[in-house]
């Protein structure tokens, strides 16, 4: 099972090594605007899942939201510690 930290490490590695066919690399290359739209999309889907689709579907949507948030962090050179200090 992945954790927030292990996912961030995996995505950071992909950003550095840029494996061919990586959806993470593709998203990073599309830029902040694209990533931001994905975050908004997944936030809405998380909300709808929480309202109407139950806990498992909500958790799935939240995992996708966290993925895109981490891609945005990497795009802008933020670390987990940069975010944690604001919690």
UniProtKB/Swiss-Prot annotation:
EC number annotated for this UniProt entry: 3.6.1.31
Catalytic activity annotation: 1-(5-phospho-beta-D-ribosyl)-ATP + H2O = 1-(5-phospho-beta-D-ribosyl)-5'-AMP + diphosphate + H(+)
One Pfam entry name: PRA-PH
Pathway connected to this protein: Amino-acid biosynthesis; L-histidine biosynthesis; L-histidine from 5-phospho-alpha-D-ribose 1-diphosphate: step 2/9
Main location, first listed in the record: cytoplasm
Keywords: Amino-acid biosynthesis, ATP-binding, Cytoplasm, Histidine biosynthesis, Hydrolase, Nucleotide-binding
GO process annotations (BP): L-histidine biosynthetic process
Gene Ontology MF annotations: ATP binding; phosphoribosyl-ATP diphosphatase activity
GO annotation, cellular component aspect: cytoplasm
Entry's localization field: Cytoplasm
NCBIfam families xrefs: histidine_hisI, PRK00400.1-1
Family to which this protein belongs: Belongs to the PRA-PH family.
Full protein name: Phosphoribosyl-ATP pyrophosphatase
Organism taxonomic ancestry: Bacteria, Bacillati, Actinomycetota, Actinomycetes, Bifidobacteriales
């Amino acid at each position: 099972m992945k954790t927030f930290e292990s996912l961030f490490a995996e995505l950071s590695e992909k950003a550095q090594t840029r494996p061919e066919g990586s959806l993470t690399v593709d998203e990073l290359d599309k830029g902040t605007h694209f990533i931001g739209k994905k975050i908004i999309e997944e936030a809405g889907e998380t909300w709808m899942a929480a309202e109407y689709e139950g806990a498992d579907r909500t958790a799935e949507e939240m995992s996708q939201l966290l993925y895109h948030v981490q891609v945005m962090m990497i795009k802008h050179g933020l670390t987990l510690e940069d975010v944690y200090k604001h919690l």
